[in-house]
Amino acid sequence: MQDKRFGELLSEGISSAAKRQRKSMAAIEQEMAEVVGYSRPMLQKWRQGRHLPEDEIVKDLIHYCVTNGRLNRQWADSLLIHIRYPGREQLLAEIFADYALSNEEQPLNNDNGTEPEPACLESPHNIVPIQSPFYIKRPGDSIALKAIARQGVTIIIKGPPQMGKSSLLLQINSAAEQAGKRVAFIDFQQFDRSSLVEADTFFQQFCNLLTHKLDLDNHVADCWTLPLGNRQRLTRYMSHYLLPKLDRPLVLAMDEADVIFDTNFRDDFFGTLRSWHSSRAHNPIWQQLDLVLVTSTEPYLFIKDLDESPFNVGEVIEPADFSLAQVIELNQKHDTPLSSPQVQQLFDLLGGHPYLVRLALYLLMEQRIAPADLFSQAIEERGPFGDHLRHHLSQLRRQTELVEGLHQVITHQTCPDQQIFFRLWGAGLVRREGQAVLPRCQLYAKFFGRYLYD
């Protein structure tokens, strides 16, 4: 069984152990392999996400990383949640009973008065874990967290890719659990392609997955014998079986909703969610259900009837780019690799783009690049942001109308075609400033100004 995310988390653990023990990664790998009784090549397969070890081995791996890498409870919890480890809380209690290393238990200062060591560096490519020191709260966070504390709410998180939407969703889910709610997290990217072709298949699979997430007996087949349409069956299954079976409110947290926009049943599915939202006013059972949806696409391009859309109701959160003060804060959290003038230079270049700011500081902290080279090589195809920029360029060149639209933005600061604008905005390439439409940041203006028509 392949699992890339497990491999990334395990790599973080091995890297932390290597730094703490002042050993090479190879030495730590060999030591870990001996501890768990497997060969180093097998351990490397786990790191690469090519195989997933058995639960007992996972326990030993976590124990090693916590003991030797002083990784905190949040790291261990993220790994166990990801693989759906049975008895997760009990295992965490056992491990950290010996090593009191959770964030809450770590002292702010050592007894000798020295400053605490910098936080264990986290990859900018991953979702930011709960209580991570690298998580930056933005204005939308407080709105979302206040909303989820109430009952019967709908929250929409909308914005371009790599804005931290999934990380915010993780924060919302955690707050919901602390408020005594049950959370069912569904990532639409996990659906097989075959499940996204026929409406009947998708609606049944959605019910099956939701039932599995809630650890309830499956009665989907019984519901599908009723002479009803898919929308009515899904609604009945939710209101007559799932919600009544739960002893507390349910948060249905759905990430990557964009996947459904490309299907022929999007109107039926999203219309169903909208009807659940509206039904709270006259049916108490729906007060027991919170809806949280995350999308990178402007929904109005796909859902023609606004009364059938769940994306224009409830609390709509659009995560903002980082402010200069927040970039300064992140620079400090990364042990200040940039001087104050260089932080301003980074902010001017990236405009507070959350992913690119974190990527830059990560590369600097890892000493993969010097500050001067970061700026001088910024728009090179093989530079520090090269992978990110080449990906966008590749996507644009498949759609000539977007190339022309972005060129118009760069040269004339306008984009008369609203559909083109929203597609460029959805890709995170442009922004509005008053009546003008501008490239998202200086980096994009320079890079696409040079390479768009090459």
Where are the regions a protein language model picked out?
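The catalytic "switch" region of P-loop NTPases
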Residues: 264-349, 363-366, 373-384
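A short, Lys/Arg-rich alpha-helix, primarily the initiator
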Residues: 1-31, 35, 59
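Winged-helix-like regulatory helical subdomains adjacent to P-loop NTPase cores
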Residues: 328, 335-434, 442
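Walker A/P-loop-proximal flanking segment of P-loop NTPase domains
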Residues: 108-162, 167-176, 240-241
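Mid-core helix/loop region of P-loop NTP-binding domains shared across ATPases and GTPases
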Residues: 211-254, 258-274, 278-290
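Conserved NTP-binding/hydrolysis module of P-loop NTPases
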Residues: 196-219
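Short amphipathic recognition helices of helix-turn-helix/homeodomain-type DNA-binding modules
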Residues: 1-8, 12, 55-115
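Conserved catalytic segments around the Walker B and adjacent sensor/switch elements
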Residues: 156, 176-195, 252
